[in-house]
Regions:
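Flexible loop/hinge segments at secondary-structure junctions
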Residues: 1-244
């Protein structure tokens, strides 16, 4: 049985109950980093930002956030000056090509909740197996747009600002850690730890490391965002108040 499991979302109630039924105690969820879901286009694309409503109209079949009309073509997203100066103007109706994660992914579920108001994805969203594959595909598709973990960013793409409540919010460390950026989420380690036993030495050492300043530096190097020092200490206190 594994002692640690990485997760990009909280446990579902059914998953939590299954864990309790099997082991007889609650799972321990440790927040170790913050991830942002970026909405990516080619770097040369003139589009700079999208609203949450526009994301719903792009990616959702049900459009519960807006009940607006679907967006199918790039001229529906760009103003006249942007469109006329772009490569899209060479084609009368240049379609938006949509890319996202598959249904087994926590990113798929998170974007569905936050950007689609729990609605259904359009069947035109091509599902790919990883954030890296989405970003590589978008980098090579002039009309491509996709959502993916910011940690997978490569040259040749850019993450759009997201307008939330009328205010455009860039994705950066400040907006993600402050909660201003609307598509940010915590990343967890699920710890299988009986409350009446101490953590195994290797598990304890790893958790102390990932929650240290050095461990959080590695988090940053991997393209994610560190949690605050107060959060680090709170997690350590919770883990080691009864464990050695």
């Amino acid at each position: 049985t594994a002692s640690l499991g990485p997760m990009s979302r909280p446990l579902k109630p059914s998953e939590r109950q299954s864990f309790i039924n099997r082991f007889g105690y609650e799972p321990t969820m440790v927040t170790v980093a913050i991830d942002a879901i970026g909405v990516f286009v080619q770097e040369s694309n003139p589009l700079q930002s999208l609203s949450v409503d526009q994301l719903d109209r792009l990616f959702s079949a049900t459009r519960y956030c807006t009940f607006g009309q679907p967006i199918n073509y790039w001229h529906e997203l760009l103003d006249d000056s942007e469109y006329s100066l772009s490569d899209f103007a060479k084609f009368p109706e240049f379609p938006v090509q949509l890319f996202g994660r598959n249904s087994a992914s926590g990113t798929y579920s998170y974007f569905k909740q936050k950007a689609l108001c729990h609605g259904d994805y359009r069947n035109t969203v091509k599902q790919l197996s990883s954030s890296a594959s989405i970003i590589h595909t978008v980098a090579n598709r002039m009309g491509g747009i996709g959502y993916a973990s910011l940690g997978s960013t490569i040259p040749g793409v850019k993450a759009l600002s997201i307008a939330n409540g009328g205010k455009e919010v860039e994705v950066n460390a400040k907006t993600v850690q402050s909660g201003q950026y609307p598509l940010a989420r915590q990343l967890y380690l699920l710890v299988n730890q009986s409350p009446d036993k101490s953590l195994a030495p290797g598990v304890a050492q790893f958790l102390r490391y990932i929650l240290s300043q050095q461990g959080q530096y590695i988090v940053r190097q991997l393209g994610y965002f560190p949690i605050s020092s107060n959060q680090q200490q709170a997690q350590l206190n919770n883990l080691f108040q009864t464990s050695g």
